[in-house]
């Protein structure tokens, strides 16, 4: 037997996230005056957790969690893709002149794309006394500010070919 604890988490976001993910992709497009592609009607909902909160939860689980148990790590904050996009556009308008004329383009949804991802995190909250500290608006603002201050991050990754995942064709 291997002593183990299993965790599941909701959608992470924050600085240095892989640029193909929704939030960094939207920020990159906003800061480069590119169209914002939104799947379907933008109503796909996700439970979002700021990366630092997820890391803190993992540390707490490693110290206080019980062997053989599983813990869901989430924020109970659900926003759809269109809501995330609108918040990021508000940050752009208040913090920079870039991205003020960016347009949203609704694109065909991926086949089998789930409408909602969410977790029940009551066990970790109740048993381990953990809860996330960073609210969604604060986390999005921190993330937006980081990408604003690090405009070459995506380009550096692209040079290392880290933006190409296995099975994807190079662009």
What do the PLM-derived regions correspond to, one by one?
Residues 15-17, 21:
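Short beta-loop-alpha junction of Rossmann-like oxidoreductase domains
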Residues 1-15, 37:
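Conserved beta-loop-beta element that borders a ligand/cofactor-binding pocket
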Residues 5-6, 24-171:
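C-terminal substrate-binding subdomain of Rossmann-fold SDR/epimerase-dehydratase oxidoreductases
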């Amino acid at each position: 037997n291997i002593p183990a604890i299993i965790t599941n988490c909701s959608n992470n976001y924050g600085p240095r996230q892989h640029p193909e993910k929704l939030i960094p992709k939207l920020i990159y497009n906003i800061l480069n005056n590119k169209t914002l592609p939104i799947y379907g009607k933008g109503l796909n909902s996700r439970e979002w957790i700021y990366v630092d909160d997820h890391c803190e939860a993992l540390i707490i689980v490693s110290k206080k969690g019980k062997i053989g148990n599983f813990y869901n790590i989430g924020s109970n904050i659900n926003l759809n893709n269109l809501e995330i996009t609108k918040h990021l556009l508000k940050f752009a308008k208040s913090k920079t002149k870039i991205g003020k004329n960016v347009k949203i383009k609704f694109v065909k949804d991926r086949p089998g794309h789930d409408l909602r991802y969410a977790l029940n995190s009551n066990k970790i909250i109740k048993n381990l006394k953990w809860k996330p500290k960073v609210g969604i608006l604060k986390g999005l603002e921190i993330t937006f500010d980081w990408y604003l201050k690090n405009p070459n991050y995506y380009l550096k990754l692209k040079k290392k070919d880290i933006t190409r995942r296995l099975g994807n064709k190079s662009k």
